[in-house]
Amino acid sequence: MSQIAVRTFHDIRAALLARRELALLDVREEDPFAQAHPLFATNLPLSRLELEIHARVPRRDTPITVYDDGEGLAPVAAQRLLDLGYSDVALLDGGLSGWRNAGGELFRDVNVPSKAFGELVEAERHTPSLAAEEVQALLDARADAVILDARRFDEYQTMSIPGGISVPGAELVLRVAELAPDPRTRVIVNCAGRTRSIIGTQSLLNAGIPNPVAALRNGTIGWTLAGQQLEHGQTRRFGAISQDTRKAAAQRARAVADRAGVERLDLAGLAQWQDEHDRTTYLLDVRTPEEYEAGHLPGSRSTPGGQLVQETDHVASVRGARLVLVDDDGVRANMSASWLAQMGWQVAVLDGLSDADFSERGAWSAPLPRQPRADTIDPTTLADWLGEPGTRVLAFTASANYAKRHIPGAAGVLRSQLKQALERLGTAERYVLTCGSSLLARFAVAEVQALSGKPVFLLDGGTSAWVAAGLPTEDGESLLASPRIDRYRRPYEGTDNPREAMQGYLDWELGLVEQLGRDGTHGFFVI
């Protein structure tokens, strides 16, 4: 293993304050990451490093600092990054404990920069809000009001406010005039907790729509804590809009972006930015996934604007990088960019595009390193092998997916916990690795071979191919060989969270502005 450099808390803090590019990678699984991490740390688990690193940290000489909390994952991740061609890789001195001991502030939960920024917006702009009981009274009185749900459509389908319509955050300014054409209609924006409803409401206010606007205070959590009933399985969505509506919304959005200092680029300017190899530039299409798949700018990534503002660290993992946003009408890109600029990003909107520029079709595919060689078998062969003793199937898939469906007898394993899982499972004569498609499993073949000393095979096409072949599956966690730490249980997701967890989450959000002040590196401003 190479000798790996070390960076200190003070090195990272100085770079953040100077707005120099850096990637601070927490390579633990998501749940331990969510318990405590620095503000601008981004979670990229060792388990999925090869699958995500090239998209999230595209420039190979980006200063990358890796840490864990003493689990031994960081040195492995740092060496793996060097092997993948990254040249400026260091370990955080002392790991998470070193950060804490040096006086660094630690935050819990996920997507904290975005959530803390939302709280700062409300604190500075006094974004109007209504309590759950007030909104229920409006519904009971059949008041002239419309409820717009700013979350992803799948979240909306899980649970929603009665009568609410799914309008993900970046779509609000574009579509509100058709959903509430009478300027006397009250517009209420909700999410699950606080951030997206605050940002959505303030977006409409910043854009100067004539309607009265308010956030549903504390979202579906507040609704539940008030003892009020949610709807489930709803499908109400925004519809088509007129060209006049689109044009008026574009004018409003551009004015907001200009106030926030958003830059402008044409295709020539974009090419110039992309040719500057000492800077990282992300090219992000902020329209709906359906629009992206129907036609997009080559080289762009699909990142719907509302989620980009909410989960910036999941996409742009290099703090200090440049963001270029793309749409086909100037509304969603400008509104999203206005928020990202206030969050301290250098951000530009790509202007002057024609329909012909959106020439590439299909879903976005993550850039990947060269895939390692592996001996493969087909599902029928595996089924035959499982009829005899000695074959152990290891499923390298998300624990939630494993619990829903897996090959009978397969053990659910996290790569970051592989050694412990193999010890727990005992020896086998041979191993067959799988996941949904076998892509992630392919990167684990050499590790299993090194740890077990046994023959290791890859299931061609993964568990999806097994299912497509009509072979049986089972559910449950009886053979989950790694702890369920790959997914942090968010108190605002699902319908069965304890009241104490939901209230605790709201209390935590309300304390974020104070934490931002103690940390002192955020660089946020509010227009």
Where are the regions a protein language model picked out?
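Rhodanese-like catalytic fold shared by cysteine-dependent sulfurtransferases
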Residues: M1-A23, V27-V146, A150-Y282, V286-R392, ...
